[in-house]
A protein has these predicted regions:
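Beta-strand-rich interaction surfaces with strong enrichment in secreted/lumenal proteins
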Residues: 8, 185-186
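RNA pseudouridine synthases
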Residues: 2-163, 272-276
């Protein structure tokens, strides 16, 4: 009615409500519509490892981002998943305003392996809760250039995010540092290289890459924490790291209880360094 209203005002019949919306809202809507069109037009299909009405587990290749970043034209893993669900009639971004399919676990661009995505909000909440409670057991394979302290062990250290998207690791506690625990098991050794299975007992940014480098067994090809000289000598410029298995260690009496005990494996490790018999 031409007057500024308060939160407590109650509308009456024939009242006129005027909305004053920032121009940035319309610019965002325009960009969002363009993004929707890009997703709809993606023809690439995800490499599906497991799927049901609630979740989809896919294999992420190296060089692909999980989420959209600065490279607007490049399809991300979640874009490809959304496009696949759109083609199957399970998701329509132009009609769905309350929920968008979302990934539950993230991998670095050059890490390969299994990624879980939820098809609905209830499943997203439950999977995220499982992950927080360490009920989703994720194991990794990696090729390391260096020597592990033993064939099998559990290493503890302290972790802090640093500058330039790097993390710092130290042996003793200090201000701002949080404890990390990493379990490793050597599967095979060839010369100065080892194929290892890693179990994250805690899960922090770059934990595997930074912690293994700290104990003297950096991941081959890792440009942030690895041995640059060795990487260059063998021509390996992306980390040889794969999230190769997921196990649902959950109770069977919850909404996603049918997943209890289910174990999934990546179809391949995707390593560019050969020589190891990876199954």
């Amino acid at each position: 009615n031409g007057k500024r209203c308060r939160n407590s005002d109650i509308l009456n019949e024939k009242d006129v409500v005027s909305l004053y919306i920032n121009d940035e809202f319309f610019e965002y809507s325009k960009n969002n519509l363009e993004l929707v069109k890009n997703i709809i037009n993606i023809s690439v299909s995800p490499e599906i490892v497991y799927e049901d009405e609630n979740i989809i587990v896919v294999y992420k290749p190296e060089g692909m981002d999980v989420h959209r970043g600065s490279e607007k034209a490049k399809a991300t893993l979640i874009d490809i998943i959304k496009a696949y669900l759109y083609r199957n009639g399970e998701y329509d971004p132009e009609k769905e305003n309350s929920f968008s399919p979302a990934v539950c676990n993230r991998l670095d661009r050059n890490t390969t392996g299994l990624v879980i995505a939820a098809k609905n909000a209830a499943s997203l909440r439950e999977i995220n809760e499982f992950i927080r409670e360490r009920k989703v057991i994720k194991k990794y394979l990696c090729i390391c250039a260096g020597n592990f302290p033993a064939n099998h062990g559990i290493e503890t250290a302290y972790h802090k995010k640093g500058q330039h998207n790097l993390v710092n690791i130290r042996k003793s506690m200090a201000d701002g540092y949080k404890q990390i625990v990493t379990e490793y098991k050597i599967i095979e050794v060839k010369g100065n290289f080892a194929l290892a299975e890693i179990n994250l007992i805690t899960g922090r940014t770059h934990q595997i890459r930074a912690h293994l480098a700290f104990i003297g067994a950096p991941i081959l090809g890792d440009g942030k924490y690895g041995n640059v000289t060795v990487n260059k000598r063998y021509g390996i410029y992306r980390q040889q790291l794969c999230a190769y298995s997921i196990e649902f260690d959950i109770d069977s009496d919850c909404r996603l209880g049918y997943l209890a005990g289910k174990k999934l494996f990546a179809p391949k490790a995707g390593f560019t360094f050969g020589g190891f018999s990876i199954k």
